[in-house]
Amino acid sequence: MVMVNFTAGKWISEPKVSEVTSEFVSITTEPKTDFWQRSYYGFRNENAPALLIDSKDNFTFTAKVSFAYQQLFDQCGLIIYLDNENWFKASIEYENQSFSRLGSVVTNLGYSDWATTDIPLPKEIWYRLSRRGPDFLIESSFDGLVFNQMRIFHLHQLGETTIEMAKCNPPLPTQKVVSFGVYACSSSESSFTAKFTEMSLEPCKWLAH
């Protein structure tokens, strides 16, 4: 396991206020920023800030996220970004003082799919993202020790999944590069600061079924 240094990362929609060191990333959101494509609402939003690194390998990426949300739909978490019509994000989205939505959005071929569960709003959470070729596992934890599955998903642009791939430990090598990292945004008239720490990268821990 190695700690991830995002100082050489690449920005999508670099924010006006951010800090990137060898130990943490801090993003202050701007109002009316988001990632979403078409489904239900019809609109296409792709102006949220995200800081990315590239890998062609199978991996497990873990990060702690700390935040103090202000308004509806404030969110921050992990992201995979292939292009504006093929990407993934995981986060807690602020709903109201009673609950928020822990969930993930998978966007394939220009349409977003949002899956959530309602939870009391914490001030921090850990996410763990694992890659096996074109398939991914996203998990979350409230203590950084015990992780629970949120979702298994596929990104179509990375190709098909075969029975042979599903049986291999470690996963079969992949040569297709993915960009992944952290993001934060405020879909409404809001702003908050998200801080990402304890960011690590290691060989894929997601075993074959």
Mark where each language-model region is.
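Extracellular glycan-recognition regions
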Residues: M1-H209
